[in-house]
Amino acid sequence: MGEEDVQALVVDNGSGNVKAGVAGDDAPRSVFPSIVGRPKNPGIMVGMEEKDAFVGDEAQTKRGILTLKYPIEHGIVTNWDDMEKIWHHTFYNELRAAPEEHPVLLTEAPLNPKGNRERMTQIMFESFNVPAMYVAIQAVLSLYSSGRTTGIVLDSGDGVSHTVPIYEGYALPHAIMRLDLAGRDLTEYLMKILHERGYGFSTSAEKEIVRDIKEKLCYIALNFDEEMKTSEQSSDIEKSYELPDGNIITVGNERFRCPEALFQPSFLGKEAAGIHTTTFNSIKKCDVDIRKDLYGNIVLSGGTTMYEGIGERLTRDITTLAPSTMKIKVVAPPERKYSVWIGGSILSSLSTFQQMWITKEEYDESGPSIVHRKCF
């Protein structure tokens, strides 16, 4: 195959957003919500093309009359029919590229069940007829995009958070930690604490409004207890937000109480350790000789690491846990919302990567299990 002249397509399937584009670009051409919406009462949508499903932004704009579903939960695909719709939309509507003409690089969550990546492989070759494909682990791509091959990635998106120690380009599976606490949980928690203020948000459409409030107004306190005290004494941290109907609501200490759950999951009724402790535990599971390299290269990735104040707070909390002489460095690249995609763009453009693709011939010969031999 003359793969040199054909650009690969890179698709990062997140629980919240799909990031898609062409290898070699420095940013995804298309970012849209991983949503499939179906009419609440079929037959109601007069004068609109009778579609049984809407994907992405179109589902978002018509959300009032649709039931919205996310086919990826906690980083793992739970509804393959909807997932196929999302991929179809990605290739044909967003990228306007025929998948049978391009190698496709997909991403997956660390510790993804084996059956999941086999199913991805099968759909790509059998439904979309791709000439070649590859499945890469999201956190490893984020590290590549930061220009490193060794470090620990704290990747937190909409559906799941992971800490993934990587040494010389290889993830260390025994030390990967997974935390089922990410952006979607924080949005739900913000809905809950806004309820206590008397603002009732409940439908799937209203949840999207709360997500927007979270992204625009929330931040992480360096010291939570002190911030709470300050917020009780003054109204400086109060901000107003205009709802789509023109009403204005006021958001106060919810601004930092919401993302505090990343450090204190007990706020959500979860027994898990916070992201600082999880990162520390992940490093402790690694060989003592490489820990220094990991402590000095803690790389943030994913939309849920975009809160103001997260780098300072993590540095402080991990310094408290780590050996006292250890130098702690948290790296927060400005483009970290898309660093998984950027890493995929870099990887699939490398000349050395071209022999890594799983080709159609190999798939026909070995079946879906080929993915475990070629993608690691």
UniProtKB/Swiss-Prot annotation:
Native species: Plasmodium falciparum (isolate 3D7)
Protein family: Belongs to the actin family.
Null allele phenotype: Conditional knockout at the ring stage results in the production of merozoites; however, these merozoites fail to start a new infection cycle due to a failure to invade new host erythrocytes. During schizogony, daughter merozoite development and segmentation is abnormal and is characterized by the presence of aberrant membranous pockets adjacent to the food vacuole. Apicoplasts have few branches and collapse close to the food vacuole failing to migrate to individual daughter cells.
GO cellular component: actin cytoskeleton; actin filament; cytoplasm; nucleus
Keywords, alphabetical: ATP-binding, Cytoplasm, Cytoskeleton, Hydrolase, Nucleotide-binding, Nucleus
Binding site for ATP: S15, G16, N17, K19, D158, G159, V160, K214, E215, G303
Subunit structure and binding partners: Monomer (G-actin). Oligomer (F-actin). Polymerization of globular actin (G-actin) leads to a structural filament (F-actin) in the form of a two-stranded helix. Unlike for mammalian monomeric actin, parasite monomeric actin is able to induce oligomerization in the presence of ATP or ADP. Mg(2+), which is used to coordinate ATP, is required for polymerization. Interacts with MyoA. Interacts with DNase I with low affinity.
Name of the featured protein: Actin-1
Listed SMART domains: ACTIN
Root EC class: hydrolase
Record carries keyword Glycoprotein: no
Subcellular location: Cytoplasm; Nucleus; Cytoplasm, Cytoskeleton
Summary of the function given for this chain in its UniProt record: Actin is a highly conserved protein that polymerizes to produce filaments that form cross-linked networks in the cytoplasm. Polymerizes into shorter and less stable actin filaments compared to ACT2/actin-2; this is thought to facilitate gliding motility and host cell invasion. Has ATPase activity. ATP hydrolysis leads to the formation of a stable intermediate ADP-inorganic phosphate (Pi) actin, which is followed by the release of Pi. ATP hydrolysis affects filament stability; ADP-bound actin depolymerizes much faster than ATP- or ADP-Pi-bound actin.
Annotated consequence of substituting A272C: 5-fold increase in inorganic phosphate (Pi) release in presence of Mg(2+)
Reaction(s) catalysed by this chain's protein: ATP + H2O = ADP + phosphate + H(+)
Broad class of where this protein is predominantly found: cytoplasm
Enzyme Commission number(s) of this protein: 3.6.4.-
UniProt entry tagged with the keyword Cytoplasm: yes
Site (Not methylated): H74
GO BP terms in the entry: cytoskeleton organization; entry into host cell by a symbiont-containing vacuole; plastid inheritance; schizogony; symbiont-mediated actin polymerization-dependent cell-to-cell migration in host
Coiled coil: none
Activity modulation comment: ATP hydrolysis occurs in the polymeric state. Unlike for mammalian actin, ATP hydrolysis occurs also in the monomeric form and the release of inorganic phosphate (Pi) is more efficient.
MF GO annotations: ATP binding; ATP hydrolysis activity; structural constituent of cytoskeleton
InterPro entries registered for this protein in UniProt: Actin (IPR004000), Actin/actin-like_CS (IPR020902), Actin_CS (IPR004001), ATPase_NBD (IPR043129)
Protein's gene: ACT1
